[in-house]
């Protein structure tokens, strides 16, 4: 197993659209395992292949589920570990939700992003079998966020120009200070 390097914005490779996966073999399984290792190493809940300079339509996720009962403290329950190959959103709700998003490619930068609250995603699993799944809450946000990466997008693309530029300046300053250390 290997831990990949994460591409950091404004690396232009993050803006390249990924190509469909066509081979469902041991090499793909190894990439998936390495992506999980990388995601866990950097404390992420989702990782798209383009973030590790693999230009394929491939996502790994391990999204914590929480109890939806109101008035109670959200209880941690088993996570939703998913591999999505060649995913596409086939249905979006009109209802939207705001969620504070972060990204391994924009370290320590967060912003409130509005996205459809509920989606249905069609994808292939690691064997190439077509699957379809409904998602809501954090899982819905994570799927949409990672699919943005496959299309050459970032969560900051959903922000106003002013908020995006402010966040990019904070990131540049943070990276500059990290290099000095």
UniProtKB/Swiss-Prot annotation:
EC class (word): hydrolase
**Which top-level group of life is the source organism from?**
Bacteria
Q: Which Enzyme Commission number(s) are listed?
A: 3.5.1.88
Q: Which GO terms describe its molecular function?
A: metal ion binding; peptide deformylase activity
The active site is formed by: 146
- The reply to whether RNA-binding figures as a keyword in the UniProt entry is no
Query: Which residues make up the binding site for Fe cation?
Result: 103, 145, 149
Q: What is this protein called?
A: Peptide deformylase
- Entry keywords, A to Z: Hydrolase, Iron, Metal-binding, Protein biosynthesis
Q: Name one GO biological process term.
A: translation
According to the record, how does the cofactor bind?
A: Binds 1 Fe(2+) ion.
Record-linked SUPFAM superfamilies: Peptide deformylase (SSF56420)
* Xref: InterPro entries: Peptide_deformylase (IPR023635), Peptide_deformylase_sf (IPR036821)
Q: Which reaction does it catalyse?
A: N-terminal N-formyl-L-methionyl-[peptide] + H2O = N-terminal L-methionyl-[peptide] + formate
Query: Which cofactors are named for this entry?
Result: Fe(2+)
| NCBIfam families reported for this sequence | pept_deformyl (TIGR00079), PRK00150.1-3 (NF001159)
The gene for this chain is: def
Q: Looking at the Swiss-Prot or TrEMBL record, what is one Pfam family this protein matches? A: Pep_deformylase
Question: What's this protein's function?
Answer: Removes the formyl group from the N-terminal Met of newly synthesized proteins. Requires at least a dipeptide for an efficient rate of reaction. N-terminal L-methionine is a prerequisite for activity but the enzyme has broad specificity at other positions.
Please give the family membership noted in the entry.
Belongs to the polypeptide deformylase family.
């Amino acid at each position: 197993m290997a831990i990949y390097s994460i591409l950091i914005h404004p690396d232009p490779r993050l803006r390249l659209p990924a190509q469909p996966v066509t081979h469902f073999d041991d090499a793909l399984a190894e990439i998936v395992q390495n992506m999980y290792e990388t995601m866990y190493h950097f404390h992420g809940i989702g990782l798209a292949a383009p973030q590790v300079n693999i230009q394929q339509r491939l996502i790994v996720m391990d999204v914590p589920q929480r109890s939806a009962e109101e008035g109670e403290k959200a209880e941690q329950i088993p996570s939703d570990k998913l591999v999505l190959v060649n995913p596409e959103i086939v249905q979006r709700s009109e209802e939207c939700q705001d969620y504070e998003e972060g990204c391994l490619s924009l370290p320590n930068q967060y912003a409130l992003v509005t996205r459809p609250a509920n989606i249905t995603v069609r994808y292939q699993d690691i064997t190439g079998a077509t699957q379809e799944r409904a998602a809501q809450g954090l899982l819905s946000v994570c799927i949409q966020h990672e699919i943005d990466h496959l299309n050459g997008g970032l969560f900051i693309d959903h922000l106003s120009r002013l908020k995006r530029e402010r966040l990019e300046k904070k990131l540049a300053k943070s990276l500059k200070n990290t290099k000095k250390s």
